[in-house]
Swiss-Prot record:
The lineage of its organism: Bacteria, Pseudomonadati, Pseudomonadota, Gammaproteobacteria, Alteromonadales. Belongs to the LpxC family. It catalyses: a UDP-3-O-[(3R)-3-hydroxyacyl]-N-acetyl-alpha-D-glucosamine + H2O = a UDP-3-O-[(3R)-3-hydroxyacyl]-alpha-D-glucosamine + acetate. Keywords: Hydrolase, Lipid A biosynthesis, Lipid biosynthesis, Lipid metabolism, Metal-binding, Zinc. Pfam families: LpxC. Its cofactor is Zn(2+). GO terms for biological process: lipid A biosynthetic process. It comes from the Bacteria. This is UDP-3-O-acyl-N-acetylglucosamine deacetylase. PANTHER family: UDP-3-O-ACYL-N-ACETYLGLUCOSAMINE DEACETYLASE 1, MITOCHONDRIAL-RELATED. One of its GO terms (cellular component) is membrane.
Amino acid sequence: MIFQRTVQKMVQTTGVGLHSGNKVTLRIMPAPVNSGIVLTRTDLSPAVSIPAKAELVRETTMCTALVNDAGIRISTIEHLFAALAGLGIDNAVIEVDAPEIPIMDGSASPFVFLLQSAGIKEQAAAKKYIKINKTIRVEDGDKWAELKPFKGFRVNFKIDFNHPEIARSQQHMVMDFSTSAFVKDISRARTFGFMRDIEYLRANNLALGGSMENAVVLDEYRVLNPDGLRYEDEFVKHKILDAFGDLYVAGHAIVGEFCAFKTGHALNNQLVRALLVQQDAWELVSFDKEADVPVSFMVPGTQAFA
């Protein structure tokens, strides 16, 4: 049987909030089987917990945010969730003492390191996967995203930015998911933004924690970061990273192919919601033998370094 996973022990880090610019402390702790990912705001009294569910993603401007019925929010979850998805973590409690997850270096790599430092352990319950049986597609103008049947988890993603630096890079990528491919080829890709947008955001008290320490920054012509890019195709890879995190609010790893053109947080979440309500388009499955599993996660106790 392929088992569910959680972390072996509590692990903690600090960083800054992308939008507030304030210090944020994050803790990741083990959780029981079938509990999923639950986020808790410890800065509130009493503390407020919000389960990671697609219907609670109620804000998708600049990030993915969970918001409960009382309006309490936890923002910028997507990079952490990409790491959880990439390492196959089914159950965890995430504590944060702020309304947003720390941005770290703008990628998922610090969260991958954190989770690997905590250790990953198997639990005494079958791991469940969402197997796509029928194609689900959502559109917004010329943007679109779809999930369709595939034996494995494949991503086919294309971006289209009218910017000379991005246009010079590869804007289309197809990858078959595995933990090692995610850690090596995707996890280090940073969020990116344009100077003209950053100036507007800061004037509106947003992106106060944003800097070249946690984002790729472009002017009208080039990348401004002194060290340049981590990957030649870092832009499309970061959009894939975001999608991994956004799709993980479905609650389980997906067996299928994710195809997308110019999609972002909003359309990714619309796709997950459309999938979950069309119950004949998918089924929950588990696997008895490692050889039968179409999605390859690393073996607990091993390391997959970028």
